[in-house]
C-alpha cells in the first residue's frame, strides 16, 4: 500500500487505522494531535515492543539527495526495532534511547513520549518521538511513532518522518507497522526526569516588551523567508527559556522538548574542550601532553604538537591553509565517511596532512585533528588509571551532575572493538540540554577559579585566540569559535567578543556578554545571527 503526502484538510480518524478498521489515506497532521496531549493519562504499563512483522503500508518522498544515497542504500524500508518502554503517570520512557538496527544506513532513536486515554474509549494512545540517525554521520530525521494500547493488546503503529536537521538528505516517510508487544510483569524502576513539561516562553513576549523586530531570534517563519530549513531556535536568559515551536512539513512537532538535535561540531566544544577542562582540574599538564602519546602519531613532525594545539586547530599539519580546504578535501571525506575502524581513521588523521608550520601558530580547521585529540585524551587517562574511555568515564558523569538527558549520553563511535568516540562530531541533544549547558557555561565564563581551559575558551581576546576567518572577525581557541564586534555598536568602550559553538549545515550556540545564550539549528548553510546579538543587547545592554 502506498500513501500520498501533505497535511489533510480533514483529519482522518487515526484510531480506525490503528485498529485496522480502515486504511491510512495520507500523512498525519501533527496539529491534530494537540487535543490528545491534553487528555487524561493512560494506564501504567511495561512492554517490549517491536516491528519485526510485516509493514502494512509505506510511502516515501525524497526531495533532496545530494550524494545519491538512495543508489547505495535502500531507503524504501523502515529500520527494525525492539525496545522496552515503561509508562508511568502518562510519561512513556524507553529503557534505551539508541537502538542499533540491521538497516544499511540508519539506526533508530526513541525519546520520552506520552500515554493518553482517548475520549470516551477504553484504550489509550501512545506518541513517541523517534528519529532515524545515520550510522556514520550526524544527520537526524525526526518523526513520531503512534500506537494504541487496550489492556495488554497493541494496535498497528504509524511511523512518520516529517522533518530533519540534514543538509544533504531530506524526505517525508510514513509507514503502517504490524506491531508486537510483550508484557513485562514488573515495572522498570529506573526513572528519569521528564522534560516534556519544561516551561518554554514565546519570543512574542520579548518583542512586545522591548520593541524588538519580529524574527530577530531566527524563529519561524522569519528565518530568511524559508522555515523549511530551520529546526529550532531559542534564547536562554537565566531561568527563562524562549523558543519557537518545532516546525515540520506536517505542522508543529507534538513533542518539541524531545525533538532530537544533532551536535555536529558542537561536539568539539563539548566532548573536546569540556573533557580537557575536567581532567585538567586534577592533571594540569594534559594540555601540554605531546600527540606522540598516540602510537600512530609518533612521526617526528608530530613530536612538538600538543593536545592543546589540536584543540586550537593549530597542529601545523595541513594540505592548504585556505579556509575549509582540508575539511572538504577528498582524503578528509574518506576519513569521515569511509574509514569505519579506529585504525583506518587514525591512519588518515596522522599521516595524510603534512607538516607546514610549527604548531600553535596557524589555524586550519579540520575535524580529523579533533579525532586525534579524543584518542590522545583516552591514552592520557589510561596512563593515570582514570579509565580507558573519556566519554564514558569523564564526560557522562559530568552530564549526570548537570542532570542532562539520556539523549546526550551517546556518541557515534568506530565500528570495531576499540569503539573510539568521534569527539569532533556525532553527539545528540534535546532542547533542555541546551538550557542546562548554557547555565553551566555562563557560570564558568565569569568564574576563573576552576576549569581554566574552558574559562579561557569562553573569554576570547587577541592574545589567546588565532584568526580563523579574518574577513568576518572570527577567531578560534580551545575548541570554541568567537566573533569580535566593534564596541561602539553597543556603546561599549572596548570591542565585544562573543564565544560560540558552531555545527555543520547551520548550527550556532552563542554566549553573550549579558549572560544570555542564543541557539539555532538549521540545515541551509546559513551562519548569520547578528540580529540576535543586537536584539539581546536591546533587552539587556552588553556593557
Predicted regions and their residues:
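Active-site Gly/Thr loop motif
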Residues: 405-413, 459-522, 527
